[in-house]
């Protein structure tokens, strides 16, 4: 398979799976396994950057609102209506810090992420989605920003494991502690923005290296495809979330795990 075709397929996979609760990292690893593709993990982060741009566009008004709130807070000119936004900013900050710590720890064990490990995590994600869909677990402490941020950060950090959906586990954790689906969706994707940019800053040297090794056109083609597909994917997921049909993703993950196990004979 040519690098151009691989970049396009990886872009499609990233664009679809970043916003659907089925684990983009798990699907990228699965695809790499079957075609024996050996690209740097930095390429995956670059694809994540493309889908983060989709989030920024989708939530541009909300992001601007939060930014203006932060400016007013910095200038000590806050108004009463800023209180909710300030709580959200603080929550996202705590989530980002905790996620970064957990994600850094997990990244040290990337060599252990085997195909069987991914498939087990697909099943775990499927179970979490079912629990989310049918409100299986509720512990309301969203009013405690510190506790809520730590809990959601820990859960989102586990999303660094391939096969565990970052969006799925974050929305699940937000729902468990009392946030409604719309708020859980918003928190999940807004908190991804600083996390991806933080990962880029931490691995800036590797980013430079990958542009020296890989074809500039191929890298950006994959990112462009991920961006375009992501625009459609995020709208599709929002509709599924509102229509309470997330269990379809559980069925998909269970079926995918069984099919791969059968053909690979794990």
Curated annotation (Swiss-Prot):
GO CC term (a single one): plasma membrane
Cellular compartments annotated: Cell inner membrane
GO BP annotations, alphabetical order: cell wall organization; peptidoglycan biosynthetic process; regulation of cell shape; response to antibiotic
GO molecular function: undecaprenyl-diphosphatase activity
Topology term for the membrane: Multi-pass membrane protein
Alphabetical UniProt keywords: Antibiotic resistance, Cell inner membrane, Cell membrane, Cell shape, Cell wall biogenesis/degradation, Hydrolase, Membrane, Peptidoglycan synthesis, Transmembrane, Transmembrane helix
Keyword Transmembrane in annotation: yes
Transmembrane domains' residue ranges: 4-24, 39-59, 86-106, 112-132, 145-165, 182-202, 210-230, 246-266
Its EC number(s): 3.6.1.27
Keyword Transmembrane: yes
Reactions accelerated catalytically: di-trans,octa-cis-undecaprenyl diphosphate + H2O = di-trans,octa-cis-undecaprenyl phosphate + phosphate + H(+)
Family designation: Belongs to the UppP family.
Biological role stated in the UniProt entry: Catalyzes the dephosphorylation of undecaprenyl diphosphate (UPP). Confers resistance to bacitracin.
Extra remark beyond the main annotation: Bacitracin is thought to be involved in the inhibition of peptidoglycan synthesis by sequestering undecaprenyl diphosphate, thereby reducing the pool of lipid carrier available.
Name of this chain's protein: Undecaprenyl-diphosphatase
